[in-house]
Amino acid sequence: HSQCDLHATTNIVATELAQKCSVPPAFNEAGELTNAADIQCCTSDISLAEYRTLQGKMEGADTEATSIEGYLAATPGWRTDLYNSRSTLMTHAESIELFKALGVKMTPELKAPSVEMPFNGMSQADYAQKMIDEYKAADVPASDVYVQSFNLEDVRYWIDNPPEFGHQAVYLDDRYSLDDFDHSDPATWSPTMEELVEMDVPILAPPMWMLLAANPDAADGESRIVPSVYAERAKAAGLDLIAWTFERSGPLANDGEWYHRSTDDVIDNDGDKLLTLDVLARDVGIIGLFSDWPATVTFYDNCMNAKG
């Protein structure tokens, strides 16, 4: 999921490669793990050959664990490890071949480097280009690829340089983390929706809560969830929208789920997932939705778009 998350996405901490980690596991004289909250293992810590010896797992780490076993056993109870059989890790190029064989489209994210760039002579632009080059080498049509990045400069690079891949490049919007940004106040948006369009950015992708607003006074026949000002302004400017991440949250009977933060006051059960999805699809008009699990979104699409 990022350059430095191998400790949470693989079994590296249970192997001899753990000692090569940027922050390896540490133990006291009794053999107890003492730094679970600080362990960090990066792809740049090991060679490709060493990387291939690891096994993948669902992302998660118990940062209060006192043993490696406990550290790895971090899947929330409302998720499942049923399909988590310690999968084979792949390079990006290998994943492209798998996706080609499966006949699916591809939406790679250029992850933010965890090292200072340039790194070993590779600039940020080189990094952005290398990802494109691997699709070209595999003869993947640009129309099958939605390249994405939280770094607007990456998106602008793809628009300007290999433009065929820039035609459906995705700007992942994480400006919610900025102190002076309010998704409900257009005066705080920089760049504005119109400025993004002027840059030829085709697709904007925020977390789904930024596209939604609560409507607590909804009358009979009206929805408790409605499109946000952010969503309305983006659509009015001509931007396509993709949202993330459906079913990442826990049960909606629990208050305070991050991906539903803008509608938390008007939802209270898991059925409201379908209401959220319906508003995103029909009222906001998203063109895509990231989900940790495909079943619910597929069920909705099959139901709403059934062809007789």
Where are these regions (language model features)?
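Phosphate-group recognition and catalysis centered on beta-loop-alpha active-site segments
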Residues: 1-308
